[in-house]
Amino acid sequence: MIDKQKTIQTYAKSANDTGSTAVQVALLTERINNLSRHLTENKKDKHGQRGLQLLNGQRRRLLKYLERTNYDEYIALTDRLGIRRGQRIVR
């Protein structure tokens, strides 16, 4: 089960920070990890697989935004959460 308050406190920049990109990515990562564990035991849960795809897409979009706006924080967050990074495309 996800301990939402603990995750928010861990990744928040201030006491009232509950919606920053880093916090959102951390919460999504917790949900993704939880759902992945569920799907290893329940391989035929097709609705769960669809939900996992949606969560991964949402996290990918948030990480893309964070990479574009604050690259140093993006690097630190992906290292901290253990998320693989793609190649950086400079435009």
Curated annotation (Swiss-Prot):
Listed GO biological process terms: translation
Keyword Protein transport in record: no
SMART domains: Ribosomal_S15
GO cellular component: cytosolic small ribosomal subunit
Pfam families in alphabetical order: Ribosomal_S15
Keywords tagged on the record: Ribonucleoprotein, Ribosomal protein, RNA-binding, rRNA-binding
InterPro entries found in the cross-reference section: Ribosomal_uS15 (IPR000589), Ribosomal_uS15_bac-type (IPR005290), uS15_NS1_RNA-bd_sf (IPR009068)
Example of a GO MF term: rRNA binding
Top-level taxon: Bacteria
Disulfide pairings: none
Reported function: One of the primary rRNA binding proteins, it binds directly to 16S rRNA where it helps nucleate assembly of the platform of the 30S subunit by binding and bridging several RNA helices of the 16S rRNA.
Database matches in PANTHER family: RIBOSOMAL PROTEIN S15, BACTERIAL AND ORGANELLAR, SMALL RIBOSOMAL SUBUNIT PROTEIN US15M
Record text on subunit structure and interactions: Part of the 30S ribosomal subunit. Forms a bridge to the 50S subunit in the 70S ribosome, contacting the 23S rRNA.
Family according to the record: Belongs to the universal ribosomal protein uS15 family.
Protein name: Small ribosomal subunit protein uS15
